[in-house]
């Protein structure tokens, strides 16, 4: 099995081949490692290698009896160096501070444990901007990640390393997280499927409702079916997680792909928040997609939520976000200090992180509460837009 052959296989195909014995986990992992070693000098998508441990885990997977094999058995994957930790493995979160201290995590997140329990073999951890705060992956701690489609461009962020690895064919599944676009933006930049799941669908423990519940975790893949498979593995409640984690799943997400899809009512718009502009090619792609959906028998109408057209209201929303965001960043830097056991100085974090941390200290409690309530209101208004007509889907450009 070569890395090129592996890159032609989606996750479902790899798992099926490992299950029927036509491919071993060792072969798949070796091919993924070879692929990573071939592309990473140009992409800089890998920040922590687990190659030797992954080889040992793959050998153990091949020796496991059929009764002990999970839905991702033997599958090589990568995980983002943020939005989750692996006990005994380095964790930097894109931060010079944790890198300088050589910090090693002491706990495995529920999300990563579910990957492991399902049989996945984590071969590496991937590049991310410091604390996932910006939509491109260019941390000063390890340097910028590059887009496999064009090395002069960014894969986006904050899950840029995972997106670059999956897009380059190193692995079929890459873990990712999203608060303000960190799954969706890299997926768009790299031509992947990127689903930000509903809030509280995938548990975030040991993080408790990061960013006030705006952060959701899943991954990036090359197919809708692989994303459904990953959601089957990661979604669902846990005794240590938030009590709000949803439990209303009757069937597998993957199995539901084979079910009937009746005509849907779909709203579409090429408007962007605050009255901004988008590239004409992107606008045309959205319009063409709407036409294709109409040709497929769906009821497709052009309709735009007010937040995308009311510039004054959008400005208010941005104000809410900046107030809440700066407080959350201040808390995140405090959490860095708790992990490292040393004060975080101005030179330990990037300039924008330090500035946001300082701004967070100037936001009074009543304004923070107002900001969080305002952001929750935006979510409720989005739901109201869908339910009023009703619409099943809102089709937009990627934020």
Predicted regions and their residues:
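Short Gly/Pro-enriched turn/cap motifs at secondary-structure boundaries
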Residues: 67, 102-104, 152-156, 184, ...
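Amidase signature
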Residues: 1-67, 233-399
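Electropositive, surface-exposed helix/loop patches at the edges of structured domains
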Residues: 155-174, 214, 218-221, 336-359
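Gly/Ser-rich catalytic/binding loops embedded in alpha/beta enzyme cores
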Residues: 2-179, 291, 386-388
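Fold-level recognition of mixed alpha/beta catalytic cores in primary-metabolism enzymes, strongest
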Residues: 87, 135-138, 142-144, 163-269, ...
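Short beta-strands and strand-loop turn motifs
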Residues: 92-94, 124-125, 211-212, 267-271, ...
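Amphipathic alpha-helical segments in well-structured domains
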Residues: 108, 192, 283-287
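Short, basic, helix/turn surface patches
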Residues: 147-159, 200-207, 326-343
């Amino acid at each position: 099995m070569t890395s090129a052959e592996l890159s032609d296989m989606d996750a479902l195909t790899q798992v099926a081949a490992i299950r029927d014995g036509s491919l071993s986990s060792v072969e798949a992992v070796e091919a993924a490692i070879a692929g990573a070693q071939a592309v990473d000098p140009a992409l800089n998508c890998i920040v922590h290698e687990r190659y030797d441990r992954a080889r040992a885990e793959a050998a153990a997977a091949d020796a496991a009896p059929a009764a002990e094999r999970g839905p991702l058995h033997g599958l090589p994957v990568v995980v983002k160096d943020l939005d989750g930790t692996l006990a005994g493995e380095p964790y930097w979160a894109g931060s010079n501070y944790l890198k300088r201290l050589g910090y090693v995590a002491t706990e495995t997140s529920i999300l990563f444990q579910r990957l492991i329990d399902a049989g996945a073999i984590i071969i590496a951890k991937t590049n991310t901007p410091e604390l996932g705060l910006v939509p491109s992956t260019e941390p000063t701690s390890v340097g910028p990640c590059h887009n496999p489609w064009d090395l002069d461009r960014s894969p986006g962020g904050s899950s840029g390393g995972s997106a670059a690895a999956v897009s380059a064919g190193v692995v079929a599944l890459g873990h990712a997280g999203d608060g303000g676009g960190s799954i969706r933006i890299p997926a768009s930049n790299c031509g992947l499927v990127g689903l930000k799941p509903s809030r509280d669908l995938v548990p975030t423990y040991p993080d408790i409702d990061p960013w006030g519940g705006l952060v959701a975790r899943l991954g990036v893949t090359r197919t809708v079916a692989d994303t459904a498979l990953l959601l089957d593995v990661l979604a669902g409640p846990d005794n240590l997680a938030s009590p709000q984690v949803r439990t209303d799943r009757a069937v597998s997400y993957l199995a539901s792909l084979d079910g009937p899809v009746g005509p849907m009512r779909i709203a579409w718009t090429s408007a962007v928040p605050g009255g901004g502009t988008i590239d004409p090619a992107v606008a045309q792609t959205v319009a063409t997609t709407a036409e294709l959906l109409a040709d497929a028998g769906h009821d497709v109408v052009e309709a735009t939520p007010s937040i995308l057209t009311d510039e004054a209201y959008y400005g208010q929303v941005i104000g809410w976000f900046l107030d809440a965001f700066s407080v959350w960043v201040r808390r995140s830097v405090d959490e860095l200090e708790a992990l490292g056991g040393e004060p975080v100085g101005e030179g330990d974090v990037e300039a924008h992180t330090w500035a946001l941390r300082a701004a967070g200290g100037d936001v009074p409690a009543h304004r923070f509460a107002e900001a969080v309530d305002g952001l929750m209101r935006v979510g409720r208004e989005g739901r109201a837009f869908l339910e009023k007509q009703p619409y099943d889907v809102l089709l937009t450009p990627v934020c």
